[in-house]
């Protein structure tokens, strides 16, 4: 995840996440980045990853009460959210129509990038997605006009999912009786699609009127503070580790 990873000699039966607080780009820029660096061979399940956070943004996150939400968001990237969705050396290919600016067929905000994992799809339909008319389901971020290119392909589409924790921006509504950035069953389902054992009971209450697609300018007019999380998906080298300790690069 950009964090410094020490030499390891121990056995890992779950996942190890290294954490680092460092200057990145000053206040109000990239708040952090995260991703896996080692995965279990033949799976899309992380073994070791890292998270780093910009020391110049910590006070802002703390003042907004967002630190826990941001850490959870970045942990999900370590587990493969937006990273293990597709790749020639991965067992799954769930990302359709990637929003890659280097692709001549990509049109900003128009290419209908979406996630096709069956569990996430079923959960999306279950919470109102059967009314979604904006394109294919489950919609993935395809527009970098409001946020940076780093938001593409690695988050749920902000204009559709709004405050959901794995959308492109973190929200603050100031109401202590509501959850600012809920963890939806769609996100949990996406991890089941990656092969993880999940608990849907851990989801927060979250329903959307998916037939309504929010215009970015209207979202900005809500005067609800948001923290831009684009650029937080670390897409560096990833290696797979076999049960015998054999290591090979897969990305």
Regions found by a protein language model. Give the residues of each.
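Extracellular zinc-dependent metalloprotease catalytic-domain scaffold
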Residues: 1-72, 78-251
């Amino acid at each position: 995840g950009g964090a410094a990873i020490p030499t390891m000699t121990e056995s890992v039966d779950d996942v190890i996440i290294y954490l680092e607080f460092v200057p990145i780009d000053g206040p109000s820029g990239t708040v952090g980045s995260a991703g896996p660096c080692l995965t279990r061979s033949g799976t899309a399940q992380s073994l070791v990853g890292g998270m780093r956070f910009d020391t110049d943004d910590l006070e802002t996150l703390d003042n907004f009460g967002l630190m826990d939400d941001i850490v959870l968001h970045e942990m999900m990237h370590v587990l493969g959210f937006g990273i293990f969705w597709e790749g020639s050396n991965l067992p799954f290919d769930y990302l359709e129509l990637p929003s890659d600016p280097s692709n001549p067929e990509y049109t900003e905000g128009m290419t209908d990038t979406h996630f096709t994992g069956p569990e996430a799809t079923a959960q999306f339909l279950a919470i109102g997605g059967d009314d979604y008319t904006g394109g294919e389901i489950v919609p993935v971020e395809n527009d970098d006009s409001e946020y940076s290119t780093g938001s593409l392909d690695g988050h749920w589409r902000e204009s559709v999912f709004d405050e959901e924790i794995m959308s492109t921006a973190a929200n603050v509504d100031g109401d202590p009786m509501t959850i600012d950035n809920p963890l939806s069953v769609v996100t949990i389902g996406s991890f089941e699609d990656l092969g993880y054992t999940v608990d849907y009971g851990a989801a927060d209450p979250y329903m959307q009127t998916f037939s309504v697609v929010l215009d970015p300018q209207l979202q900005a007019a809500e005067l609800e503070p948001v923290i831009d999380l684009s650029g937080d998906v670390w897409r560096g080298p990833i290696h797979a580790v076999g049960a015998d300790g054999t290591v090979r690069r897969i990305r």
